[in-house]
Curated annotation (Swiss-Prot):
UniProt keyword annotation of Cytoplasm present: no
Keywords attached to this entry: Early protein, Host cytoplasm, Host G2/M cell cycle arrest by virus, Host nucleus, Host-virus interaction, Modulation of host cell cycle by virus, Phosphoprotein
Spans annotated as Disordered: 24-89
Entry protein name: Protein E4
PTM note: Phosphorylated by host ERK. The phosphorylation triggers a structural change that enhances keratin binding and protein stability.
Basic residues bias spans: 46-60
Length: 113
């Protein structure tokens, strides 16, 4: 005998839709028994939840900051690269830094923005 052959009970049906009552409190079905005032108020009140923390956007300087920007203290990257040990090149949305180590090896770092 297989369990799947046994008749399954009919699914439970209900005429009580609490979410609809929250949306449309005046359209409660008349067939429900009257509840006391406190229970009705609890059903109509939305559940108390803490709001998630709001993210604040952090303003970041754009990649195209000019060398004359007075907010950058000291020499800029391009000014430092004039010493010949490393260079910075930009192309579209990428920035490439090429540097020479004291041992003579060349290191290249490319950032795709």
């Amino acid at each position: 005998m297989e369990d799947s052959a046994a008749p399954r009970p009919a699914p439970r049906t209900t005429n009580h839709y609490p979410l609809l009552e929250l949306l449309y409190p005046q359209s409660q079905p008349q067939s429900q028994p009257q509840q006391n005032q406190q229970e009705q108020e609890e059903q109509l009140r939305p559940p108390k939840r803490c709001a998630p923390p709001r993210r604040q956007r952090v303003r970041r300087p754009s990649a195209s900051v000019s060398s004359s920007d007075s907010s950058i203290p000291g020499p800029t990257l391009r000014e430092r690269s004039e010493r010949g040990k490393w260079s910075v090149t930009t192309s579209g949305a990428s920035v490439t830094l090429t540097a020479q180590t004291p041992g003579g090896a060349t290191v290249t770092l490319t950032l795709c923005l």
